[in-house]
Every structure is written in structure tokens, then in C-alpha cells.
Design a protein with these regions (language model features):
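C-terminal luminal/periplasmic domains and tails of membrane-associated envelope-modifying transferases
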Residues: 2-14, 320, 429-695
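Polytopic membrane enzymes that build or remodel cell-surface glycoconjugates and lipids
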Residues: 1-491, 501, 506, 512, ...
Length: 695
């Protein structure tokens, strides 16, 4: 009797949802724990540190008027990713722990929503004869799909890499939208149903604005409604389809807001036969990664002609050729599983359809910036796991205990692999070295590793690495520019200038293939400026400004040289024009305020600086300059208010308290001035003690 009661309680506990939610969240958090200590890696510098559109809530609407990258050829329209960065920056300032925490929470939340969604969908996919109406096995199957998906290491670049969160955002909002639609259908009250449908549509739009792959979510949604959903009237179906078409129309309209991006990157021009081979190779690689996720790294490729340059490289390429066979075999397995009869056939068909729909955009059918990438499996992997669970559920009941144990073992193995992979993103140097060691030998990775060595002062290592990059890609402008900077540091001035000159001359040709070619041109101008040859420096900068319109770094350099040689009046028109065209640019507003202050036009200086203070909610430079201007005019109360705001934004910076103390002293508040100086002494003492505590 006692055993029967215990068994009954165990069954009841298994049927409850909250223990499963806790397990999913806890395991998902633990396996990615190392990523919380991660620093800026790769594109994080552009999207987090230097991104002007995340520094203030004022840019919530402006984010929809720009592509994700300002100075690149990629037309990634992902404003919601920038909105998430705005929230992170507002809460965490520059603390990267918070950015990584958001990534992790988004992934966990996506996994929880996936479990809820699959629980709803599986009921429509289960045959009448499946488990004799017993849904517990199917519910457990949905749980294991979500759990395996959460811990799978192929998602590392979407979770552990700050810039990779677009996958999680799109997944989260798409899942939420689907669940809201299901809930709306069950609602009785018209107002509640209308609100839920509206929120579902909004979630769908946010998913599309997070990442383009959300279009596949809409196809999956319509596929399920068409072939699997029961009880939906024809009228409701057509209304739903029209609403989705309208949603895509709104998204298409939003994509017209950014300036038209003319991509000059040459097409690969692959013939259809080659694309077919690459599709099979990538399919084989993705299937292998789902089952045996080893040797994980960025810059993957199933097309590497350089692998045939030596015998060892040829042997490596033989493995790539076998991927085509594996891809063909996996495709055959999907087709066979979809047609094989059984109670779980609907589940297998839906899983195979999910995977193939998610795979087609990343299959090399259309040209992308790579032939294969692990994080592209973020959505298709769900279909793979659904298909696998569909195969398992058709096995005899007596095998399910063993299979559940195997699934738990897989969770442990995948979780350990995810934890190890998560540690690859701790620092930029660790990331680049491990990527190279795992086989991701691209010029970009090598160039970034060389720059990381140069930043640490290891110029000999940096030079060797960058010269190796140029042996692989002789025209790579960033590597050429970085090598020139290293050579200057080493005292090889003549070779550095020759390298910068040749890179600048080649820019007209290389800019069609590479972004940021203006960096080498600017470095050459800076080199002439250092040599006091400002006439030559200005000539180079002026030409660069016309060749690369709208690049602030070029305008900033030219205006600074003009200020030094001809005064503030000569520099103001350049900066003023840029600031007028780009109201959101903090650096331009600060520079304009400084120039007006130097000219003596204090009202305009203060207006520009006040505008700048709204563009970055954590930077205090504009407020401190306003305080200094007010202090100079003996407007002590205004200076005090501005500097108090500066201190509130940067309470850990001694210089802010020094200026505050000066203002208080001028106001006759001697005691408060001394308190401010005492805070300076305390902060300096803490700064001296911090290294000792760290050691």
C-alpha cells in the first residue's frame, strides 16, 4: 500500500511542470556559467563597445533606421538586437557580465518557451493509437527535446558570444508569438482574444527584426496550421495567412528605412552543380555536429581549396568529401523516417520538415558569408531533435527506460562539452588561439590574433603572425595596416610607410572586396601628421573624406589637423555638417562643443554639449565640460548641478570629484569641497589596493 502511494506521488510529481522548468533553467545556467566572465571578442568591439546606437534610450526608434553594422557591407537588419543592447547598457553600463547574463537568460527563456510550445504542438501530432491515449511519454519527449536543445554545444556562438544573441532573440519572440496565438484561440472574451492576437503579431514582428531566420518560423507556423492543426475553420485559416502576409509587409517596409546599401563584394559565381555538392556537404556537417559535436570552432568551411596544397591537407580534405555522402545518407534517413508508418509518424514528418525548412536558408542554396556555421543550427536543431524523439517513441515500451538513461547520459556529455566550449570565449586571445587550433584558419582570425599580440606589446609575435596573414591574403587591408603599425613600433619607419602607401593606392581596388579600407588611408595621413607634414596629411584626409563619405574617424582627424594649423573656425564646418546629418553621434557632438568653446561661442558650445549629454547616459564628459563653462562664467549654481550629474554618472572617477570640489570652493561651501577631495583620496587608495587584492 505504501509502495503504491509512493509510486502515485512519483507519477504526480513527474506530471507537474514546475520541476521540469527548474531543471531546464538550472542546467542551462550551469553549462554556460564560464561565459559570464567573458570579455569583448570579435564583433563585440563594434556592436557593444563602439556602437553609437546603444548608449541612450533616445535611440529606440533610430535603431530601426540603420543596419546592424555601420561600416560593413552586410545588410543585417536587426534593430531588436540593438534595442536589447540599449537595455543592457542602461542597466549595466560597460559591465560585460550583464551583457553575458542577458544572453544566457535569453537562451534559457527560449528553451522554456520551446518546452511549452512543443507540449502544445505534440498533442496535434500524436496519432490516436499512440500510447493508447497516454500523453506522458510525449510530454517527456517534449521535455527532452528542450533539455537537449538547451545544453547542445553547437549553440555556443549564440549564447556565449554577446554579438550572437540575435538567434536567441528571434527564437524567443517567435516562440512567444506562437504560444500567444494558441492562447488567443482558447480565449472566450473578445477583448482578451484581440489583445492576445495583437501581442502575437507584435512578437512575430520583433522576431523578424531580431534576425532574418524568423521568416522560417512563419513558414513552420503556417505548415503546422495547414497540415497538422485540427479544429481551425477555413475562414480563420485564411485570416491567419493574411495577417502573416501583412506582418511580412510591415517588416519589408521597415527594411526600407536604412539607406540603401550597395554591396560591392564580388559574388562567388558558383555553378549549380557546385552548389548541390556544397548543400550535401553542409548537410553532412550539420548532421555530424548534432550527433558528435566535436572540434567546434568559428570560421568553419566545407569549401577550402587551400587544403590541397600538401599531402596532409589533402587527407584533411578527404574528410570534407565524405561529408557529401553523410549528407546524402542523412537526407535519406529523414525521408525514410517521414514515410515509415507508426504512431509517431506525424511527429517525424513535422521534425523533418522543421529541420529542412530551417536548413534551406543556410544550405548554400543562396550565397551567404560562409558555407557553414555552427550557430546557424539554433533553429534547425529543434527539428532534428523532434525527429529523433519521434523515432524513439515508436520503439517498444520496454526500451524506454534504457533510452531515457541514454538521453540523460547525452545531456551530461553535451553539457560538459558546452561548458568547455563556453570557456573559449573568455578573452579575445583565447578565442583566436583555440579557433586556429581547431581548424578555423582564416585570415581574419590570424589578423585579430596578431593585433591582440600587438596590444600586449609582443611586437615580434605580432609581426610574424601578420606577415603570415599577408602570405595567405596579400591584399587584406586591415592586416597590412596593423603590420605597418607594428613596424612603426619596432622602429622600421621606412618599411611601414611603404606598406601604408601601397595599401592606400590599392584601396580603390580592395574596397570592392574588403570593408574598412579607409583605416589604412587614415593611418598614412596620421603618419604624415606625426612627421609635421600637415599639408600632405590634409590632402590625404580630404581625398579620403570624399572617397569614404560619412566616416567620422576621417572627419575627426581632418578637423583636428585643421584646428591645430588654422584654428577652430576652419574645423567647425566639417564637424557641424557631420553632426547635423548624424544627430545621434556622441563623438561629433562633443567635438563640436569643444570647437565652439575654443572659438569663444559659449552658448553654442553649451547647446552642443547638452545635446551630447543626452546621447550617452553613462558618459560624463559633456556634463563636466558644461560645468567648466558655467564655472568660467561664474554661474556657480548651474555648474554645480551639471557636475553633480557628472558625478552620478561616474561615481568611481576621481577627476569628477576634483571639479566638484573646485565648484563648491567657489561657492563658499568649504566643508563640502573637502568632503569631495576626501572622496578623491579614497578612490585613489582603492585603486592602489585593487591590484594587491586581485593577486
Amino acid at each position: 500500500m505504501i509502495r503504491a502511494e509512493q509510486f502515485s506521488r512519483l507519477v504526480q510529481l513527474r506530471e507537474k511542470q514546475w520541476p521540469r522548468f527548474i531543471i531546464l533553467a538550472l542546467i542551462g545556467f550551469v553549462v554556460h556559467l564560464p561565459s559570464l566572465q567573458g570579455q569583448l571578442v570579435w564583433d563585440d568591439s563594434f556592436l557593444v563597445r563602439d556602437n553609437p546606437f546603444i548608449k541612450s534610450p533616445l535611440f529606440i526608434f533610430e535603431a530601426f533606421r540603420h543596419y546592424l553594422f555601420l561600416d560593413f557591407y552586410s545588410a543585417h537588419y536587426r534593430p531588436v538586437q540593438n534595442l536589447s543592447f540599449i537595455a543592457d547598457y542602461f542597466v549595466w553600463n560597460g559591465n560585460l557580465y550583464g551583457f553575458h547574463l542577458t544572453n544566457l537568460l535569453l537562451h534559457i527563456a527560449s528553451g522554456l518557451l520551446l518546452y511549452l510550445l512543443l507540449g502544445k504542438l505534440f498533442s496535434s501530432l500524436r496519432g490516436v493509437e499512440a500510447d493508447n491515449g497516454n500523453s506522458s511519454a510525449w510530454s517527456l519527449g517534449a521535455f527532452f527535446v528542450a533539455l537537449l536543445w538547451i545544453v547542445h554545444p553547437v549553440h555556443s556562438a549564440a549564447v556565449d558570444y554577446i554579438s550572437g544573441r540575435a538567434d536567441s532573440l528571434a527564437f524567443f519572440f517567435a516562440c512567444a508569438g506562437w504560444l500567444l496565438f494558441i492562447r488567443a484561440r482558447k480565449s472566450i472574451l473578445l477583448a482578451a482574444r484581440t489583445a492576445l492576437y495583437s501581442f502575437a503579431a507584435l512578437s512575430g514582428l520583433l522576431a523578424l527584426c531580431s534576425r532574418e531566420i524568423a521568416f522560417v518560423w512563419i513558414l513552420l507556423f503556417l505548415l503546422h496550421l495547414t497540415f497538422f492543426e485540427k479544429g481551425l475553420s477555413r475562414r480563420a485559416f485564411f485570416i491567419t495567412v493574411l495577417c502573416n502576409i501583412g506582418l511580412l509587409g510591415i517588416y519589408a517596409g521597415l527594411r526600407t528605412l536604412p539607406e540603401v546599401l550597395v554591396s560591392t563584394t564580388p559574388s562567388q559565381g558558383w555553378p549549380a552543380s557546385m552548389r548541390a555538392v556544397l548543400m550535401l556537404r553542409s548537410l553532412g556537417d550539420y548532421a555530424r555536429l548534432m550527433v558528435f559535436p566535436v572540434n567546434l570552432h568559428m570560421e568553419r568551411s566545407v569549401l577550402a581549396p587551400e587544403n590541397y596544397l600538401s599531402h596532409d591537407q589533402w587527407r584533411h580534405s578527404a574528410g570534407v568529401e565524405y561529408l557529401s555522402i553523410l549528407g546524402l545518407a542523412f537526407l535519406g534517413a529523414l525521408i525514410y523516417g517521414a514515410f515509415r508508418a507508426g504512431p509517431s509518424r506525424g511527429l517525424r514528418i513535422f521534425g523533418a520538415s522543421w529541420f529542412l525548412l530551417g536548413y534551406l536558408p543556410i544550405s548554400n542554396l543562396i550565397e551567404l558569408n560562409a558555407t557553414v556555421a555552427e550557430h546557424w543550427l539554433y533553429l534547425p536543431s529543434v527539428g532534428f531533435l523532434i525527429f529523433a524523439i519521434g523515432c524513439v517513441l515508436d520503439l517498444p515500451v520496454r526500451y524506454r527506460g534504457v533510452l531515457a538513461g541514454c538521453a540523460c547520459s547525452a545531456v551530461v556529455a553535451l553539457g560538459v562539452s558546452s561548458t568547455i566550449r563556453s570557456s573559449d570565449w573568455l578573452t579575445d586571445e583565447i578565442f583566436y588561439r583555440r579557433t586556429l587550433a581547431a581548424g578555423g584558419r582564416s585570415s581574419r582570425v590570424l589578423a585579430n590574433l596578431g593585433q591582440a599580440c600587438a596590444n600586449r606589446g609582443e611586437y615580434a609575435k605580432a609581426e610574424a603572425i601578420l606577415r603570415n596573414v599577408l602570405r595567405l591574403s596579400a591584399d587584406y587591408p586591415i592586416a597590412r595596416r596593423n603590420l605597418a603599425e607594428v613596424l612603426l613600433r619596432e622602429g622600421h619607419k621606412k618599411e611601414a610607410e611603404e606598406l601604408l602607401t601601397s595599401t592606400t593606392k590599392a584601396a580603390e581596388r580592395t574596397r570592392k572586396e574588403y570593408p574598412l579600407t579607409w583605416v589604412a588611408v587614415l593611418s598614412l595621413a596620421l603618419s604624415h601628421h606625426r612627421e609635421k607634414d600637415d599639408t600632405k596629411a590634409l590632402a590625404i584626409a580630404e581625398k579620403a573624406r570624399h572617397d569614404y563619405p560619412g566616416v567620422w574617424e576621417i572627419i575627426r582627424f581632418e578637423s583636428e589637423v585643421l584646428r591645430q594649423t588654422r584654428g577652430a573656425n576652419a574645423a567647425i564646418p566639417l564637424v557641424d555638417a557631420f553632426a547635423h546629418d548624424n544627430w545621434w553621434h556622441y563623438g561629433a557632438a562633443i567635438a563640436l562643443g569643444r570647437l565652439y568653446a575654443e572659438k569663444g561661442d559659449l552658448p553654442r558650445a553649451e547647446a552642443a554639449l547638452r545635446h551630447a549629454s543626452w546621447l550617452d547616459v553613462h558618459d560624463a564628459e559633456a556634463l563636466s565640460l558644461i560645468a567648466a563653462i558655467s564655472l568660467r562664467q561664474n554661474r556657480f549654481e548651474e555648474a554645480y548641478r551639471a557636475q553633480c550629474r557628472a558625478v552620478a554618472r561616474q561615481p568611481d572617477q576621481p577627476r569628477q570629484y576634483v571639479l566638484l570640489s573646485n565648484i563648491l570652493e567657489k561657492m563658499g561651501r568649504i566643508g563640502e569641497a573637502r568632503d569631495a577631495l576626501a572622496e578623491v583620496a579614497l578612490l585613489k587608495a582603492l585603486g592602489r589596493d585593487a591590484p594587491a587584492l586581485a593577486n
